[in-house]
């Protein structure tokens, strides 16, 4: 536990937060910290990485924890810390590095400054002033927002581990998909850019073709492709699958998902409230068939991801079954 100098502030000015920072460092580190930057960041500890440096265009895969000066954890990517300190651990959360960017100003000023000091494999522990926990955009940046709301109103300790960087996130996803196809599906080719489909069970009865505009029930399980396990289940409407992955929820109704069938993929996409890749896959089926579709985030949840189960820029795989006629 840290020796805290963080008290209820008389005011929230920059100068007050600086005094709190200075006092905390003096008590806990003395002069044995690494550096004090011009912007007011105290770099407390660092471990140099041996990999590539962070470029303005880099997509940075980062494990992190945010801790206030009292030693209270506020957020983390570490499941053990979430379990021990935050009480937020859940098997339904996808625990993996976050993707932080510099070029598109989705990352706050303090984190961006720290990342630019780092190389892959490196770690840093630093106190970031609250005024650097927002995003300051350059004057020529095309946004209606000049400075975002600050993430924190007090000084915050950032513990950051830079796991890897990627220059081209689209190509990174394509490589994951290609490797996935080769590892599990005999190297099948994509049918459109970033989208793969394979029929696993075919219905030979021609009369079981689904008519355009028909509402049908489909059953599915959705998983994240990460190049490691490729098996994290983020959603299913099949009770046995939920049980197998220890995701069963007694309060959930495991029934078919009603979708409107269209043979043309673009019609299927535009007439259903589904991610593009899932809707595109439905257009490939007849009644009583099963298949697998996997695709890049451009056909899925894109740069935003979805909640705590689907990270940003995540390729996904769906196992899908259509109802019998």
Which ranges hold each PLM region?
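Cross-family detector of peptidyl-prolyl cis-trans isomerase
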Residues: 5-325
């Amino acid at each position: 536990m840290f020796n805290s100098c963080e008290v209820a502030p008389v005011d929230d000015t920059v100068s007050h937060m600086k005094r709190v920072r200075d006092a905390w460092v003096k008590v806990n580190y003395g002069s044995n910290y690494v550096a004090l930057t011009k912007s007011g960041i105290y770099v407390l500890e660092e471990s140099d990485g041996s990999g590539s440096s962070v470029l303005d265009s880099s997509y940075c895969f980062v494990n992190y924890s945010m801790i206030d000066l009292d030693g209270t954890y506020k957020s983390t990517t570490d499941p053990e810390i979430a379990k021990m300190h935050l009480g937020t651990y859940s098997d339904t959360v996808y625990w993996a590095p976050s993707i932080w960017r510099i070029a598109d100003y989705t990352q706050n000023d303090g984190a961006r400054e720290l990342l630019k000091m780092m190389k892959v494999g490196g770690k840093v522990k630093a106190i970031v002033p609250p005024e650097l926990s927002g995003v300051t955009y350059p004057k020529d940046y095309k946004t209606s927002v000049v400075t975002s709301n600050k993430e924190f109103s007090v000084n915050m300790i950032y513990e950051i581990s830079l796991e890897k960087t990627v220059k081209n996130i689209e190509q990174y996803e394509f490589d994951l998909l290609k490797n996935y196809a080769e590892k599990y599906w005999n190297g099948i080719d994509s049918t459109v850019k970033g989208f793969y489909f394979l029929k696993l069970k075919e219905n030979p009865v021609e009369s079981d073709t689904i008519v355009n505009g028909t509402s049908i029930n489909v059953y599915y399980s959705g998983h994240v492709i990460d190049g490691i396990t490729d098996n994290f289940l983020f959603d299913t409407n099949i009770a046995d699958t939920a049980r197998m992955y220890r995701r069963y929820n007694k309060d959930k109704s495991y029934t078919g998902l009603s979708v409107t069938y269209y043979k043309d993929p673009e019609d299927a996409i535009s007439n259903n409230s589904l991610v593009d890749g899932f809707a595109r896959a439905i257009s490939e089926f007849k009644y009583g068939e099963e298949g697998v579709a996997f695709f890049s985030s451009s056909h899925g949840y894109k740069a935003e991801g979805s909640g705590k189960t689907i990270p940003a820029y995540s390729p996904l795989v769906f196992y899908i079954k259509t109802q019998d006629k």
